[in-house]
């Protein structure tokens, strides 16, 4: 898996000060995408053990609220194995002390269909994240005042063990 960038002190991609990994690879190609260069799965840098260690080191800082996975799309099919490794590692090390947010262009219903069709890796990812921001960015529905979203069709889902908490 490749990634475009890592931000180690971000406050716009989730609650609190966060470490944000922008992965490469996206099938959605949303009009007006904030990171169009990340559509190409080969863009950027190779994700390595050293990259993971840098993320873990930043999460060990007391100021850091957690990890956000964005992109591109972390749930781009070719990214899922590595993203599963990342969220499993972070959850295993920090439990509920650090939250994990994940942004995807897929909707909750689309993801549930993929799980029903046998995507075990996707189910594992959803079980290990705390917040899912779903839905494609729709330029015509862009709202500057939205918190943690780009367009008003996108939804913020709080999850426990892969299930929505209302």
PLM features: what roles do these ranges have?
Residues 6, 72, 135-136:
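Fold-independent oxyanion-binding glycine-rich loops
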Residues 12, 109, 165:
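Flexible, glycine-rich phosphate/dinucleotide-binding loops
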Residues 26, 74, 137:
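Hydrophobic pocket-lining residues within nucleotide cofactor-binding pockets
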Residues 1-3, 17, 35-120:
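Conserved Radical SAM active-site core
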Residues 118-119, 123-166:
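Classical nucleotidyltransferase
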């Amino acid at each position: 898996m490749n990634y475009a960038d890592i931000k180690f002190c971000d406050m716009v991609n989730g609650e609190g000060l966060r470490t944000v990994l922008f992965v490469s690879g996206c099938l959605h190609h949303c009009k007006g995408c904030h990171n169009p260069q990340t559509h190409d799965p080969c863009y950027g840098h190779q994700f390595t053990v050293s990259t993971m260690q840098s993320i873990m080191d930043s999460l060990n800082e007391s100021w850091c609220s957690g990890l956000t996975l964005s992109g591109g799309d972390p749930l781009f099919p070719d990214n899922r194995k590595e993203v599963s490794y990342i969220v499993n590692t972070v959850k295993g090390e920090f439990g509920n002390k650090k939250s994990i947010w994940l942004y995807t262009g897929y909707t909750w219903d689309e993801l549930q269909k993929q799980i029903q069709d046998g995507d075990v890796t996707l189910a594992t990812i959803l079980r290990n994240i705390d917040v899912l921001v779903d839905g494609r960015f729709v330029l015509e529905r862009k709202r500057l005042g939205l918190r943690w979203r780009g367009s008003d069709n996108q939804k913020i889902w709080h999850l426990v063990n892969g299930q929505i908490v209302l």
